[in-house]
Each structure stands twice: as C-alpha cells, then as structure tokens.
Amino acid sequence: MLERTLRVLEYNKVKEQLLEHTASSLGRDKVKHLVPSTDFEEIVEMQDTTDEAAKVIRLKGSAPLGGITDIRSNVKRAKIGSMLSPNELLDIANTMYGSRNMKRFIEDMADNGVELPILETHVAQIVSLYDLEKKITNCIGDGGEVVDSASDKLRGIRTQIRTAESRIREKLENMTRSSNAQKMLSDSIVTIRNERYVIPVKQEYRGVYGGIVHDQSASGQTLFIEPQVIVELNNALQEARVKEKQEIERILLMLTEEVAVEADIVLSNVEVVANLDFIFAKAFYAKRIKATKPIVNNERYMDLRQARHPLIDPEIIVPNNIMLGKDFTTIVITGPNTGGKTVTLKTVGICVLMAQSGLHIPVMDESEICVFKNIFADIGDEQSIEQSLSTFSSHMVNIVDILEKADFESLVLFDELGAGTDPQEGAALAISILDEVCNRGARVVATTHYPELKAYGYNREQVINASVEFDVNTLSPTYKLLIGVPGRSNAFEISKRLGLSDRVIEQARNHISTDTNKIENMIAKLEESQKNAERDWNEAEALRKQSEKLHRELQRQIIEFNEDRDERLLKAQKEGEEKVEAAKKEAEGIIQELRQLRKAQLANVKDHELIEAKSRLEGAAPELVKKQKVNVKNTAPKQQLRAGDEVKVLTFGQKGQLLEKVSDTEWSVQIGILKMKVKESNMEYINTPKQTEKKAVATVKGRDYHVSLELDLRGERFENAMARVEKYLDDAQLASYPRVSIIHGKGTGALRQGVQDYLKKHRGVKTFRYGDMGEGGLGVTVVELK
C-alpha cells in the first residue's frame, strides 16, 4: 500500500486513536506496525477475530489484560546468564499470571457456551508456568523487595540485622539522653552516615567519644561520629548486611536460572498476549466509534450502509449509503466546493483501509466491502516546493503514477480531478483520465466542480453521477450523498434568498443557453424525486425493521418463559431449603455454645429452653414462617419502647433487655450472654414492676471465654468476612479483650479497606492501626477495644 495513500487518507490518525485502547507496550508495538493486508483469507480471519473480541466486551465489559508488560529483553538476558533484578523478575511473574488469567478467562466463557473458536485457538498456545510464577512471588514482595521468607538463611540474617540495629540504637540513645551529652551534642538524635550509626557531636567535643568521624555539617560545627563503644557492633552489622546481600544475589540468580530454563515458553506466551492485547484494542476501538463487522467479499463490490468517517464526531457527521462495483464501477460526484465531496471520498478510502487492517468500520450491519490490492488517492494540494511544482503539476505527477499502476484490483480516488488549470482543458483531461482508469477495470470515486462532467455519467454505462445535497433554505450543504443525481450550482436560488432582485436573476438566466436551463431544471426535478423516493423507502424500511424486531422479541420472550418457568420454581425451592438448613445450623451452633457456657458456669441457661428452641426449628419451614408471621402480627409492641425495657424475642422465645435503638425498626438486645439486633415487630414488651435495684445483664469476662486473639479472614468473600468481623468484635468485648488482631492479607486491598471502614463505625472500637513488622505489616489490622 502506498505511503502517500495512507497519509492523505489519515490512516495514521486512526492508528493513534487505536493506540489509546491498548493495555501494554506489547499491544502498542503491534498497532504501530499495523498496515492493511491484501490477502482475502487473512482479512476475513482478522475481521472474525475482532468480532469475537467485541462479543467478549459486550458480554463482560472488558478483558483481564492488566499486569502484562514487555519482558522480552529481560527473558533474553536471563537466557544468556545475566542476573535479573527483583523488579524484572516480578514483571515476569506478573506477565505469566496475566497470560494464565487471560487463558482461563476465555476458556471459562467458552465452557459457558460462548462461541469463541479463534480466541480459544490463541489462548490454547499459552502454557501455564504456575510453579515458576509462585516461586518468584514467594521470594519477591509487591514492592520489588526480596522477602524474609525467600529462604531460611535470609530470615536468620535479617533477624541478626534487626537485633544488631536494636542494640546499637539502644546504646546510642542512652548516650544521647544522658545529662552530660546535652551540651556536647548538636541534637539528641541517632542518624546514619556511610551505612553506619552515628551521633552529631559538636566540634569542640570530638575527643570525648572517641571512635570514627564519618561526616561533618556544612558549617563544620557538627561532626557525625561513630563512638568507639559501638564500632564492633557496627562492624557486626555491616558483616550481616554483606551476608544479606550475598544471600539475596544467590536467590536472584536461582530465580533467573529458573526463568532461563523456561525462556522459550515465556517468550511464546508473551507473543500470544501481545496479539490478544492488539485484538482487544481493535474491539474497544470499534465500540468507541460504533463500528460493525463488514461482510468481506471477493467479488470487487462494496455496499457501505450509513457510512461515517471515523475521525469526525458521530454527533455531527452525516452518514451516507455508498455502493460501488455492482451496477456501476465509477462514481463522479459533482457540485460546488465546500459541499462535503472530499469527506465522502475520504470516508470510502479510510473504510477500505480499516477493513483490510482487521478493524471494524463505522457502518450499519450487513455492509459489504471487497479487497483491493492497491488503493490510490489524489487528494488535497501537496505541491512540492523543492520541485517548484504548481498545484496542477503536483496533481498531474501523482495522476501519471496512478495511471501507470492502476488495474482491475485497484481503488482509485480523485479529488477535484482536472483542477488548477483552464476549466475547459481541465474538464477534457478529467474525462480522458476517467476513461483510462475505467477501461482498466479499477473502481473509481472522483469529485469535480466542472459542469461538463455532469453528462459523463449518462454517456458511460459503468459510470453514475452523484452530488452532495444543498439546502437552499439554510444556504448550506446537508452533506447527504445523492447517488444518480448530478450536482448543480444553486447560484440563482442562493442569490434570490440573499435578496437579489428577480429582474437581475431573470436577466442572468437569459445569458445561459436553453439547454443548460433545461438540464438544471431536470436535475432539480430528479433531485426532488429521489428525495421523495428515499423518504418513502426509509419509512418502509423502518416499519419492516420494527416489525421484525417485535416478532423476534415476542419469540424470545415465549422461549425464555417456557425455559425458565420450571427452573425458577426449582431454584426458589432450593433457596428456601438452603435458608432453612442454614438457620437450623446456626441455631444448633447457638445451642451448643450455650450448653458449653453453662458447663463453664458462665451463664444460667435452662434445658427446657434449649429443647423448646430446637423443637421449633425442627418443624417444617413453611409452618415456622407461618407461625412467626402470625406472632408478629398479634404481638407487635404497642408501648413506646425504651432502653432497659424487658422484651420477649419471638424467634427464640427468650427474654431479653433492650440496650439501644440502632435504626427506626431495630434494637440491640441482650439475651443472656448474647447481644444481637432484633426488629421491633419480632419482640413483645414484658410489663415488669420497677425494682429499686437493676438486675445485671449477664456478661462474660476473663480468660475462660474461649475467643481467639486474632481473626483470620484470608480467602473469605467480602460479605462473609464483614459478618465474621461483627460477631468476632462482640465476642472479644464480652471476653474483655483490650486488643485483638484481624488478618485480612494484602491482596487487592478491597477486604482490608472494608474491614477498616467497618471499624470506623463500630462503637466498641477505640482505635486501630496496621500491624508492625513482626505483627504482619499491611496484612493485619490491630484493634484497640474500649
């Protein structure tokens, strides 16, 4: 494909927009090297592939391409024996995870009945390297640091380092806190110079501490001295750090060697995910410009329905129907300048280039396009200053080149053919050039403002005239392409609308020939007839589509109703049974807990209450629900409830005491040792006489209440985790724990954020923080309870 054609049709601007939808540098590299194909089979496959990716986006909204980076150079370095850095190894692990995740994503969709044969073929080439991926992530943290657990030796060395640092700091801090030190030190701090711990000593007291001077302040008044008493400790610390560095290098070399062993597979996987990134970028771009998959034919004709230029705002562009190659092989668009002829010409060219690049094009469904071996375009004023060529000469140089190369597999686009010279000679040249290209079997779209070419379409069987509609009322083009209607100047109508007198206009009409007037009148009537015919056709087509859509919708609804009816009934029954079973299990757990507490003599619970509660749950679920509804209706509290009131909780048949109102319809109720939320409609007020001494609510304190000091939420779903946090905090408060730990892991951070958002609202939480280095760091939240 000629570079000049790609430039004048703004193909690279389309590629720039396509680049915005890539997820990695791998995909961007593919886009930068994208050129139109001329192979029919390849183009069909590319269109089908883009269509499958577009289907994925319609169903899922996106594709999991995050975390993928260009690791090819790193893998090649590993292959020749270079040691990779922690971040380079982490990039490799993340890319391996991304490729594995993408493979699983496509295969899961296919397993669920989504037809994606081409994408399945792509992901089938991805080889999972899970073991290598885990080895890297087990040794290297998210921040690119080699973690303590990378090896037992590294863990031991870092323990030594922390111990040595602690001893050094302790000694130095004791020195800085002494009363004598205040006058000798510039500041009571411990700092580091040249990787050794030092203290800032005033110049005049340098001999007091002995040791080694490592640095001085800009003024020279302060010396950073390593006191003699910690020199040996600092030496031991440095030795440990050297060992740490050596062990880290050993681990990195080991991991690099593992990568080198699998280098060919890793590189192959990278190529697959690069192609997938490229494919999905095409699909996302299609969604952005509202493009569809064209039918690609091998019969040298195109039928672009409601075609739009992809670089023009779809809100302002006027779509057009453009057909070429069946009933006619050449379209000559005539009419005045600034009427949108060039936009129409470029729309044809860019749609063909996009389609042959595997991109969907901005047209309606069922549009067709063919494959051209060559696309030639002579558009715009590109005269060469160096060659001192005029506008006409510049165009003619390009046209000569086109005439030498154009054949029956070519698409030729001429903009203002014959312009830039004497109108009569220019029109004659334009006709001859069109005849030459048409005789070679090429498909041609040409624009011109020469009136002589209006008759050209009527004298040649394979040529048709066209024009861009002009609205005389608004004095502006509508940009609507009218196939079969030649353009006219509209000069008389425009002048009349602008106020020129009828007398002057009539005199002007007398100056042109009768034949010309007849032709203009004929064109006007033809234009009006075409408008009416097109309007009627559009109305009929709209009604047909509406009827077909309604028919399809009714059929779909009937099928769905018949298919889903039994399934929904079964699902509802199953869900009901699951809820009842879950309620039974929960009640069993409560009963078991109460019995254990009774054995520990921490609560006063009667056997007949346990048996009665269990017997109610053992009954049929519909009966239980029915009884509860009746009870709720008959026993809804009529009295204004207050904190401290005694109530009967109908679900359990137990008495409780109101603690506080948590919402318009719910109270926090203490039932024995348990505290729970209960709706007002599910409780019955008990009228008890006031006593001079309040009866204490049963509480549980001390170590005998077996609640763990930490709650592990790793692997839990978000909703389940929040429910466990709520119950755990209640239990911990009952056990009088001052501090507990909640383990949520690092992960994506969603669970961690959810836990901390909940802690902010919990009344029993005094404060909370992340765990320290020995407590689990960012993977743990330590909670101080009130």
Curated annotation (Swiss-Prot):
ATP binds at residues 335-342. This is Endonuclease MutS2. Endonuclease that is involved in the suppression of homologous recombination and thus may have a key role in the control of bacterial genetic diversity. Keywords: ATP-binding, DNA-binding, Endonuclease, Hydrolase, Nuclease, Nucleotide-binding, RNA-binding, rRNA-binding. One of its GO terms (molecular function) is mismatched DNA binding. It is an enzyme of class 3 (hydrolase). Residues 711-786 form the Smr domain. Its EC number is 3.1.-.-, 3.6.4.-. The gene is mutS2. It comes from Bacillus cereus (strain B4264). One of its GO terms (biological process) is mismatch repair. PANTHER family: OS10G0509000 PROTEIN (PTHR48466:SF2), OS10G0509000 PROTEIN-RELATED (PTHR48466). It holds the Pfam family MSSS. The keyword Acetylation does not apply.
